[in-house]
């Protein structure tokens, strides 16, 4: 969470959320995660763990031109409805599965690269903060890769405090949820809502199912997507983007460390849900705590946390010879940040990649 939350906060800033809307957004994510994990694990007796979409937050943070927070909420509602449709209409799920993995990975890599590069923009203004943290991340990742992002956050907070860059800390308080009526802006729906759905499905839900199946569980796809889609839809009006199946957290909860007996590992779900319910309760305080930290630190924490995912996505995108050109086209357009007809680069990157792939395969017939 230490590396993922700054990405969410970057997303809230990108769409112009107020402090109250930001607190509601973060708490809504906690509510959706807690409810999804609790319902799915208890009903299925499987360790089905939910999470918010970190790649989705990265997409929001890197999508320019969103006219208002309410327009972003409209995109969140659309993404949630599309997830529910995927649960109800099986051919739609098959269509998503037919998007080549290299194209999906290239779109994800382009989204993540923009946030990774953003941390280097703070080097000229805060070199004494950013550069030591980059060195710490490299060293920590070599010995304790799972704790590297947390180490950067903790060390960065201490370093920022010693440099006098930390604002006064907020008092502990409960979150007040704020309802937002969505605005239906066509460009935002197409440029943010559709890519958010695709990123959530391709980068979170499909790997989440793969982790569960690799651990010997056979979760029913439609009910799982229905629960996460419904949770996403309900909390979208609180300003929260999509929730989905977890992959990394699920790998922990589905392994022998959770319980020696695979049939009893589902118990991890309620405990996991309880933590996120507590997180939702004090979301405003958590947001206030992170808001007290300097932007350079948050950008560095987010960027270093995404380095591994970016490297993995780049490797998946460019590893195969057959689709490499199409993947490179998707990557280039997505990372460019270009906006056509008011629609963001992630959508156009996907379109260009699929177009290159279709032309290439047609000419090779």
For each feature predicted by the language model, list its residue ranges.
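Helix-loop-helix junctions within the multi-pass membrane cores of secondary transporters/permeases
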Residues: 1-9, 27-108, 219-307
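Buried hydrophobic packing segments
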Residues: 11, 59-60, 211, 253, ...
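Solvent-exposed, flexible loop/coil residues
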Residues: 53, 173, 178-183, 241-242, ...
């Amino acid at each position: 969470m230490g590396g993922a939350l700054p990405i969410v906060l970057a997303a809230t800033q990108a769409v112009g959320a107020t402090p109250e809307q930001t607190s509601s957004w973060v708490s809504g994510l906690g509510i959706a995660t807690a409810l999804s994990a609790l319902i799915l694990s208890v009903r299925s007796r499987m360790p089905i763990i939910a999470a918010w979409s970190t790649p989705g937050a990265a997409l929001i943070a890197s999508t320019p031109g969103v006219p208002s927070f309410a327009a972003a909420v409209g995109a969140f509602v659309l993404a949630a409805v599309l997830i529910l449709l995927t649960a109800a209409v099986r051919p739609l799920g098959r269509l998503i599965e037919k998007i080549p993995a290299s194209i999906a990975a290239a779109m994800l890599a382009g989204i993540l690269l923009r946030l990774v590069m953003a941390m280097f923009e703070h080097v000229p203004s805060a070199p004494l903060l950013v550069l030591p943290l980059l060195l710490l991340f490299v060293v920590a990742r070599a010995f304790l890769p799972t704790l590297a992002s947390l180490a950067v956050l903790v060390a960065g907070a201490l370093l920022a405090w010693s440099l006098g860059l930390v604002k006064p800390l907020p008092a502990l308080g409960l979150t007040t949820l704020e309802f937002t009526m969505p605005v239906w802006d066509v460009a935002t729906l197409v440029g943010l809502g559709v890519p958010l759905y695709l990123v959530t499905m391709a980068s979170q839900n499909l790997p989440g199912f793969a982790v569960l199946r690799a651990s010997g569980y056979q979760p029913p796809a439609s009910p799982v997507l229905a629960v996460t889609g419904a949770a996403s839809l309900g909390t979208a009006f609180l300003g929260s983007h999509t929730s989905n199946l977890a992959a990394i957290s699920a790998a922990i909860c589905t392994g022998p460390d959770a319980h020696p007996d695979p049939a009893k590992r589902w118990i991890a779900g309620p405990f996991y849900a309880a933590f996120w319910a507590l997180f939702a309760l004090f979301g405003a305080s958590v947001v206030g705590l992170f808001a007290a930290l300097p932007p350079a630190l948050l950008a560095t924490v987010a960027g270093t946390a995404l380095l591994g995912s970016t490297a993995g996505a780049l490797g998946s995108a460019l590893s195969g010879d057959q689709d490499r050109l199409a993947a490179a086209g998707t990557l280039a357009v997505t990372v460019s940040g270009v906006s056509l007809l008011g629609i963001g680069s992630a959508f156009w990157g996907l379109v260009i990649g699929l177009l290159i792939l279709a032309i290439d395969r047609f000419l090779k017939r």
